[in-house]
Amino acid sequence: MKLNHKTVLALFAVTALAVSLEAALSDQDKQFLAAYGKAHDALVADDLSGAKAAAGDLGTEGAELSKSASLKDARSAFEKLSAKTKQLAAGQPGYHVYHCPMLKKDWVQTSTTTANPYGGRDMVGCGEIQKQH
């Protein structure tokens, strides 16, 4: 198949547009990712009040986390938030999807040092990067 220069330029423009659309995050999405990071850090430290405080910046998605009565409840709510976060972080530089093989749970973080939010201090190092963006 022979492509002329106009076709090649058009394909390049469409590809560039698709990449720029994927990379663009709204201010609301940026706020969500920042709050998710704060909740993550709090759960790593077994800090229920810190996780609940971060939930306020997660919008309606943070309601379950904000009402958590225990770390177990907070981690269950955080797992649901991680599904949305994986979608938001896809294609964003600096975000890494981690997986804990023991608990079979995923989360997103910006650090390349494993910080498992599901096992707290007891399992902080359990997990590995599944996908880097």
Give short role names for the model-derived ranges.
Residues 2-11:
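Bacterial N-terminal signal peptides that target proteins for export
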Residues 10-18:
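Bacterial N-terminal signal peptides
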